[in-house]
């Protein structure tokens, strides 16, 4: 069958489409990120997602089912344990996470780790608890500026996050401290999935805002992924957003950092004008970071509408031998209690101008369907010990 020369995989970070059968085991009852967002607003204008068939896949208030949807679409279950960024993305590319990444949500980090971090960086530490970024800055941002102490905090994810003011603490110093933290947290008892630099600006409480100079220091994937298979066989693997950070650069041939999700789509549109063969892998993080965690369904809805405008431009630029895949890495229902991710199905929406058929496909048991399909398209074998079955033959 016909193979695609370029595949664009866009991850709308946290856009879940309803709780998985095991969601209650994760404390997530009746969650539905996309559905509840639509119910929270008076209108929801996403014509391009609508014509692809998103409302055919999942009922959405204000959005009609398409009579003739353009795309193939289905729900994907998460096979791995967890509901975090790394687990979702790693599974997409073939890895099955059977042991959850260690979290320090309830306990904070061990004093021994904090003492070593202070000793190595020269900065005292405040915080050491689970918190949202906005709350921790309101509480400790002024103190950090006045003292030079580091704000260290975590979340429901396997992360150690360090906040520093861009002007008084300095970006280079923040990155240096995070590199030390990453080295220390490779130790088994302190191991976290990611260390995240969280720079911010502002003069006082209520004015602090995190900047786009965030940097993630992730663990290397424990095995080879579809990205490695592509790169090792001479194909392009162009990342946009935090994809390269999530995989610690493994299997990436070109990395493009984004200032926002809108910027990420603008970068994707520019990449579409280039001649390459392989994968453009995009993560759009604002949905999760700005709206999901902050439990702001109205802001989330507006972000989806902005995405839909740029999606229209993507659809116009797609060539006959291009394939677009739209998906998500987990849920983050902004109407749910708390501030954490939610365990949900995610969408798989696939479209090419050359497709002759369309419609609903059967739910699959793993996000790894994506990586397997991409590898199959380029006639590559997936690395050993990966999961996922290709649906390429159905994308006609």
Curated annotation (Swiss-Prot):
Keywords: Cytoplasm, Isomerase, Manganese, Metal-binding. One of its GO terms (molecular function) is manganese ion binding. Pfam families: Metalloenzyme (PF01676). Its cofactor is Mn(2+). It catalyses: 2-deoxy-alpha-D-ribose 1-phosphate = 2-deoxy-D-ribose 5-phosphate; alpha-D-ribose 1-phosphate = D-ribose 5-phosphate. The keyword Cytoplasm applies. GO terms for biological process: 2-deoxyribose 1-phosphate catabolic process; 5-phosphoribose 1-diphosphate biosynthetic process; metabolic compound salvage; nucleotide metabolic process. The keyword Isomerase applies. One of its GO terms (cellular component) is cytosol. Signal peptide: none annotated. Its EC number is 5.4.2.7. Mn(2+) 2 binds at residues 288, 293, 341. Mn(2+) 1 binds at residues 13, 329-330. It is found in: Cytoplasm. It is an enzyme of class 5 (isomerase). Pathway: Carbohydrate degradation; 2-deoxy-D-ribose 1-phosphate degradation; D-glyceraldehyde 3-phosphate and acetaldehyde from 2-deoxy-alpha-D-ribose 1-phosphate: step 1/2. HAMAP family: Phosphopentomut. Belongs to the phosphopentomutase family. Isomerase that catalyzes the conversion of deoxy-ribose 1-phosphate (dRib-1-P) and ribose 1-phosphate (Rib-1-P) to deoxy-ribose 5-phosphate (dRib-5-P) and ribose 5-phosphate (Rib-5-P), respectively. NCBIfam families: deoB, PRK05362.1. PANTHER family: PHOSPHOPENTOMUTASE. This is Phosphopentomutase. It comes from Clostridium botulinum (strain Alaska E43 / Type E3).
